[in-house]
Amino acid sequence: MAREEGEQQESMAEWLIDVLGEPSAVRNPLVHEPRRTRELSDLLLSYEYGCFLLESKTLGIFDRIDIPDRSALRKGVLRHVNKAANQLAGACANIRRGLRITDKAGQDITVNRDWPIHCIILVPELSLIADCDELIPKLALSLLGNSKAFLNLVDLSELHNLVYNAGSIASKSQKLTRLMAFDGILLKRCELASHHKTPDFRFRMTVADDK
């Protein structure tokens, strides 16, 4: 059941990211390290102005005999978020090292390695960690300083809102694609998150119509 829970959340994330248009996201890409080949991230999307890495974390509550209380769920989410941040830091390092990256069939994936990387951690529900006011600034500063990457912590509802926001911005622009708008939205959201008192916030960006 936990595997199904994780697969479902990853599939929803992949579907939402693919709404942004071409190129499509790659599910469970592989990085070929000198000693072994392993998964780079849950999702990878690269385009001409950068790339996005997404790690999806679930709680596996359907495998448990007793439903945990919110305090236990909070601890579980925090543990998974820290694990995801470490995984993303490693993925960023492998991208910067120029290691070969492929899909599961062994086909090479062209990855933009020159621009800062957008790292997304997808959790089941942001409200579970609403009181963790130091979480995002700490993790975001670490990723930015060590990996030249921007971090956004979202749940499916917020990811849906951000994708919809990107489509709305792109529809009012002659120059911006949905992917470009999504890139800009994540950048501004990451900047705002470092000044926010809680990871549980909703973000929407507006721009002037240039048509």
Label for each model-derived stretch:
Residues 1-40, 45-211:
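Intrinsically disordered, low-complexity Ser/Thr/Pro/Gly-rich regulatory segments
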